[in-house]
């Protein structure tokens, strides 16, 4: 039976309904500080921990719950410990509801100082949580307001929390404190080793980096059917990220490893555009990208950029999907569609395709969203900041050929350049205003990627422009582009043979812009 609960929370979401329900059931509530005041102000019967322990808070609240009566009450195993607990003057505590000081939010506050951050390292909270989690054979510990209703439902039914739920909650509690300690370690190890610590002078890559992940769901399989797989959600994932996407399909096949990797690649690319846009992806590479006056028009154009490759593809859209777009989408066999949202009548159309997976992200992260990216190598991770640049690099670039690009060519180069960033290197994108016409991806030689892009484009290559994710090492790329009627090029520049490359462009009357930025993708 739950007779006594200790409640001490920084996040007060759902606090009052929880406490009122417990009080109605005759549960004695112990509490501290701001939580105690919130309960008392709301008329919920509450006993301060000071009264329970007989010891006042000291050191400006640094020491409140670090007391044998508190931890003895939590850790006591039952009759075997009754005598010891009685000698301490304590009583059994059956339920601990505790979440921790907002360390992560404090670190992110503009202008925060090192002493402020240190004061937001919780000590008493993790100690109580770990004590309760260790003793989950008797005690229920709740660190997430999302679990309040389930815990209350069990108490309503049987007067206690089941052993299976206590074990699940204890597992979650240890993950909670582990992630918290990881954040503290990450912060401290990012500070300069010499001199006074300063929150404003932190290193981007701390010495110790802890990743807090929670399994969201199993996958149908891994990259291949003989490999198992699961999807893990990152703690604190940003709103609008794939990790928080809602599945809205008709209940057909589950997502696979490849589906998620492709969906992520497509959604990353579609974020580049502010006007209605569609991206079609196969094996993480865009095969067609377009913008338009509507999603329906944008998708139709993107699909037709490479209709053969679009079959069985992944589509990302950057607006709420309406019925008109849905009706065009179902014309082609697709694996997945991802978008911020869908209208009810769009869902009605899309759900006629039983095995079409639909994901709604609820928001669209900006193209320049900053975060770290990770890639596993044998025994470790390589970590870098996300490649968030591309916008403005063409218009802000340097014209190096005799002929400057026209406004129409600049518009096409800008689109091609944004897309090129999302194509596996060596990457070549041919574009006209509002759409790609040919993409060459992942080749070991750049000229081969040019050849593939021109082959994909066919006659559409004539009059198109070319974007290259890295410099041209030889003029052969420009010569081949000229043979296919390409009129302008955007590339980073920086080759030892830049002069020869520019001369080849001038000989063919091709406009050329050096962006000064490379966008390798591996």
From Swiss-Prot:
Q: Name one GO cellular component term.
A: cytosol
Question: What PROSITE patterns does the record point to?
Answer: MGS
Swiss-Prot/TrEMBL catalytic activity: (6R)-10-formyltetrahydrofolate + 5-amino-1-(5-phospho-beta-D-ribosyl)imidazole-4-carboxamide = 5-formamido-1-(5-phospho-D-ribosyl)imidazole-4-carboxamide + (6S)-5,6,7,8-tetrahydrofolate; IMP + H2O = 5-formamido-1-(5-phospho-D-ribosyl)imidazole-4-carboxamide
Any coiled-coil ranges, and where? Answer: none
Catalytic activity, EC: 2.1.2.3, 3.5.4.10
Boundaries of every MGS-like domain copy: 1-143
Q: In which pathway does it act?
A: Purine metabolism; IMP biosynthesis via de novo pathway; 5-formamido-1-(5-phospho-D-ribosyl)imidazole-4-carboxamide from 5-amino-1-(5-phospho-D-ribosyl)imidazole-4-carboxamide (10-formyl THF route): step 1/1; Purine metabolism; IMP biosynthesis via de novo pathway; IMP from 5-formamido-1-(5-phospho-D-ribosyl)imidazole-4-carboxamide: step 1/1
Name its GO BP terms in alphabetical order: 'de novo' IMP biosynthetic process
Cite the NCBIfam families for this sequence.
PRK00881.1, purH
> Could you tell me what this protein is called?
Bifunctional purine biosynthesis protein PurH
Q: Which gene encodes it?
A: purH
């Amino acid at each position: 039976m739950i007779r006594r609960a200790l409640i001490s929370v920084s996040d007060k979401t759902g606090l009052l309904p929880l406490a009122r329900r417990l009080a109605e059931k005759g549960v004695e509530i112990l509490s501290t500080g701001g939580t105690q005041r919130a309960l008392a102000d709301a008329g919920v019967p509450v006993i301060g921990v000071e009264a329970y322990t007989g010891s006042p808070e000291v050191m400006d609240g640094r020491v409140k719950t670090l007391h044998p009566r508190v931890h003895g009450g939590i850790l006591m195993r039952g009759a075997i410990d009754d005598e010891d607990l009685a000698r301490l003057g304590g009583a059994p505590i059956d339920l601990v509801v505790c979440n921790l000081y907002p360390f992560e939010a404090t670190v992110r506050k503009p202008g925060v100082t090192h002493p402020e951050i240190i004061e937001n390292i919780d000590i008493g909270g993790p100690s109580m949580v770990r004590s309760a989690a260790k003793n989950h054979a008797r005690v229920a510990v709740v660190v997430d307001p999302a679990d309040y209703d389930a815990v209350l439902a069990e108490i309503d039914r049987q007067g206690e929390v089941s052993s299976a739920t206590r074990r699940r909650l204890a597992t979650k509690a240890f993950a909670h404190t582990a992630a918290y300690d990881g954040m503290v370690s990450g912060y401290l190890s990012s500070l300069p080793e010499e001199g006074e610590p300063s929150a404003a002078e932190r290193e981007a890559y701390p010495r110790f980096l802890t990743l807090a992940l929670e399994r969201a769901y199993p996958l149908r399989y891994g990259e291949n059917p003989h490999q198992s797989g699961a999807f893990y959600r990152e703690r604190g994932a940003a709103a609008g990220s794939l990790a928080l996407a809602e599945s809205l399909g008709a209940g057909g096949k589950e997502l696979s490893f490849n589906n998620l990797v492709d969906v992520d690649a497509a959604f990353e690319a579609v974020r580049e555009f502010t006007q209605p846009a569609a991206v079609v992806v196969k094996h993480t590479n865009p095969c067609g990208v377009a913008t338009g006056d509507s999603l329906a028009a944008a998708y139709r154009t993107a699909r037709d950029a490479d209709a053969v490759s679009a079959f069985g593809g992944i589509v990302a859209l950057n607006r709420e999907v309406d019925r008109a777009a849905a009706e065009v989408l179902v014309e082609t066999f697709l694996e997945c569609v991802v978008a911020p949202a869908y209208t009810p009548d769009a869902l009605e159309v899309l759900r006629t395709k039983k095995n079409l997976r639909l994901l709604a992200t609820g928001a669209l992260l900006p193209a320049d969203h900053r975060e770290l990216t990770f890639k596993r190598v044998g025994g470790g991770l390589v970590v870098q900041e996300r490649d968030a640049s591309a916008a403005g690099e063409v218009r802000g670039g340097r014209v190096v050929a005799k002929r400057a690009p026209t406004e129409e060519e600049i518009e096409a180069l800008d689109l091609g350049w944004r897309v090129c960033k999302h194509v596996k290197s060596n990457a070549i994108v041919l574009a006209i205003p509002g759409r790609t016409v040919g993409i060459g991806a992942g080749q070991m030689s750049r000229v081969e990627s040019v050849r593939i892009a021109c082959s994909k484009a066919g006659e559409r290559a004539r009059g198109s422009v070319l974007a290259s994710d890295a410099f041209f090492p030889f003029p052969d790329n420009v010569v081949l582009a000229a043979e296919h009627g390409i009129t302008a090029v955007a590339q980073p520049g920086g080759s030892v043979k830049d002069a020869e490359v520019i001369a080849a462009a001038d000989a063919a009357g091709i406009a050329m812009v050096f962006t000064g930025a490379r966008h390798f993708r591996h």
